[in-house]
Amino acid sequence: MATGKIQTKFGDIEIEFFADAAPKTVENFVKLSKSGFYDGLAFHRIVPGFVIQGGDPNTKSAANRSKWGTGGPGWTVKAEFNKNKHSRGALSMARSQDPNSAGSQFFIVLKDSNFLDGQYTVFGRVTAGMDAVDKIAALKCDSADAPVDADQARMVKVTAS
């Protein structure tokens, strides 16, 4: 079973990946994690009662704040919609309007959001550390849903195997 961990200042978020349901998506996330791509990035979109979103390389610097939410790894992964639900703790790929545009950005669901089912690729779930997720979700944000103090929302290190 493939697993991962997102280290944050609020504690570790432990993840179980759904490699059978979304093999290419899991492979992509593991590859990015092993390369250090996610280390130091911020959860740049925080919508209380909905999701926290991260994985944009533009969030390494506050100077790029206007570009937060637009970055990726330079490639995309085809959608792998599956039977897994967008329930609390689900790990899913963020994307643009094109279903096949996911790259590195992902989100963790804070509250059951079944309206996302079949439209976004669920590729894992949080098995421990939802308390850390909830603390990130409670951070003060600006009008663009970005954390006012991005250092509070940083992913210190992301590992996966």
Where are these regions (language model features)?
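Cyclophilin-like peptidyl-prolyl cis-trans isomerases
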Residues: 1-161
